[in-house]
Amino acid sequence: MARHISCGKLFTGLGDGAEAGQTLVLDGETIRYVGPSAGAPEPEPNDEVIDHSDHFVMPGLIDMHVHLSYGNAKSEEDIDLYAPVEFRALRGLEAAQRVLAAGFTTIADPTTTGHVSLAIRDAIDAGLFPGPRISTSGRQITNRQGLSDWYPSWIGVPETSIGVLCRDAAEGIAEIRLEVKDGVDFIKIAIDGDSMNPSSNVLVAGYDQDEMTAMVREA
């Protein structure tokens, strides 16, 4: 069963502007026709006809840097400490639904709390909830004074942090293997300092070239 969508204006992204009086015919995941309504194929008896003749229609947007588990965080501590992981998962699911409602059908989440974004991705893929396509990493791999190492040394990097402290390539490789086992789509490595950390230098690399090469090769 195909879907015939009549569009008031259609923006395909292939040209500079939107065209009026267009029809879009979708057959599953295949675009069968896109163009002037006058040349569109006639609907078959079981096809679905959708009238968006008074709407602006466009492809879904893509956002490659979204953090579903953060919420409306006011500080690093707010991200890592002030809400249990279970609440962050529910908050992240609600955020994913708002992202979809805003027109974003594909997002990437480079750093999440625990397995929050992986669980949201899997729940959406299983059809339990509406939401965008999600590609996500696990916790970001960081070194001393890097992203997520923003607490005093006597506190360290807590388990509820969005980052995991890996002090050399061996620890980074072990974390990469664990995250791959858990089903991440990609790995995030924070290789430089953090401007939010007063003791950090953003011009100093957290890993040298050999360490980065080893971790990237493993990933």
Model regions: which residues?
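Short helix-capping segments at alpha-helix termini
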Residues: E42, I124-P132
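Short alpha-helix plus adjacent loop in nuclease-associated cores
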Residues: Q140-D149
